[in-house]
């Protein structure tokens, strides 16, 4: 029903890029004269980064406890996580590259695998969830094509899409605040589905299909206030989202506050929001908390399904590589079903391998 021709989609995207470049940005500044080559030896890590650069490389383990709406313990489980994403650069500046991301998690809202300890059997699969080409022909324009992760602006996974979500398609990002006021303008066309088939190789066939569109703007007004707004069409459903973040470092109670919400306008109407705040102590300990109201089933954070919930979390940076974090979530008031989680507690220990590689000059 929503299928479109890939050729026509690519043509429209290319035409939009060219039109924007010629009309809005005009002529590019004259090229600067390159300095004479230096005889200083290039470090080994820099030689690697010329061609290959890691964005993320970490492992973690999580204990998760869930109690349902009827006070039944439905999960006491130890899980593990791997996140690895890097890019191959065709040119030294990285204007043209191919990125790939390998992750645990067997669905669109899952980024963890079961160890076999506790509830459920072991899960050992890893999936290439992201694989996409990036082009930055000029400073103001970025194009992504392939298996991509959604972008939320100032919203978070509470009211937008889960941090582990994925889709197939194209995204055009324009960063030209001097010409277009907004810091970022994002236009997306693609297919969002195959929720239990996370491997990008099983989803490449969706590149010639379209059931997901998004138009988003984002703006930082000053050092204290930033906002975003977007319209999303997803498989027949129309949704608007807005988010605003206030940075208030002089306020002793919190460093920042965020309000985010969504309005589903068609076919069924719905509304949800979250308000949250956070405080960091000596760059080591971060405390956060808030309240969320979600009234409809969607691909948002799996730990915050339908219902009203209070949440509080913490993140302790033990060393450059090691972090210990946790979150407590408590449903308040009526919940949709007997099996809906009423209480959830997560405790996470993570090791950032990328920081170790940087320490030894390998990235």
Regions found by a protein language model. Give the residues of each.
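N-terminal secretory signal peptides that target proteins for export/translocation
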Residues: 1-8
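Bacterial N-terminal signal peptides
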Residues: 12-21
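Beta-barrel outer-membrane channel/assembly domains of diderm bacteria
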Residues: 26-143, 172, 176-177, 220, ...
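Signature for the C-terminal beta-barrel architecture of outer-membrane proteins
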Residues: 34-47, 52-58, 72-79, 93-97, ...
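Short acidic, glycine/Ser/Thr-rich loop/turn "cap" segments at secondary-structure junctions
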Residues: 114-117, 150-158
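Short, well-structured alpha-helical patches and their helix-loop capping segments
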Residues: 125, 160-164, 311
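Residues on the solvent-exposed faces and adjacent turns
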Residues: 147
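Flexible, glycine-rich linker and terminal segments associated
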Residues: 258-268, 277-363
């Amino acid at each position: 029903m929503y299928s479109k021709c890939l050729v026509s989609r690519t043509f429209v995207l290319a035409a939009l890029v060219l039109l924007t470049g010629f009309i809005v940005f005009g002529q590019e500044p004259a090229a600067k004269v390159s300095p004479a080559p230096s005889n200083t030896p290039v470090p080994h890590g820099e030689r690697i980064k010329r061609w290959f650069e890691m964005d993320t490389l970490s492992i973690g383990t999580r204990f998760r406890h869930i109690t349902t709406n009827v006070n039944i313990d439905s999960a006491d489980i130890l899980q593990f996580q791997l996140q690895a994403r890097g890019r191959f650069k065709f040119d030294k500046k990285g204007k043209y590259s191919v990125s790939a991301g390998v992750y645990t998690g067997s669905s669109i809202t899952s980024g963890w695998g079961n160890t076999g300890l506790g509830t459920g059997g072991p899960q050992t699969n890893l999936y290439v969830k992201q694989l996409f080409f990036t082009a930055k022909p000029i400073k103001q324009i970025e194009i992504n094509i392939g298996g991509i992760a959604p972008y939320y602006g100032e919203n978070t996974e509470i009211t937008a899409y889960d941090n582990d979500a994925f889709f197939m398609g194209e995204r055009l990002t324009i960063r030209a605040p001097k010409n277009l006021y907004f810091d970022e303008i994002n236009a997306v066309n693609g297919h969002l589905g195959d929720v239990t088939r996370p491997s990008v190789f099983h989803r490449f066939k969706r590149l010639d299909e379209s059931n997901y569109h998004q138009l988003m703007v984002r703006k930082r007004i000053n050092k204290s206030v930033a906002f975003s707004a977007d319209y999303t069409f997803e498989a027949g459903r129309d949704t608007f989202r807005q988010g605003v973040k206030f940075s208030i470092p002089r306020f002793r109670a919190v460093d920042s506050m965020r309000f985010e919400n969504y309005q589903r306008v068609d076919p069924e109407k719905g509304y949800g929001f979250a308000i949250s705040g956070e405080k960091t102590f000596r760059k080591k300990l971060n405390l956060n908390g808030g309240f969320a109201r979600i009234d409809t089933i969607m691909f948002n954070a799996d730990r915050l399904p339908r219902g009203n919930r209070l949440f509080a979390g913490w993140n302790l940076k033990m060393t450059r590589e090691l972090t210990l974090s946790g979150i407590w979530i408590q449903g308040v008031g009526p919940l949709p079903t007997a099996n809906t989680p009423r209480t959830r507690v997560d405790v996470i220990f993570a090791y950032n391998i990328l920081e170790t590689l940087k320490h030894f000059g390998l990235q």
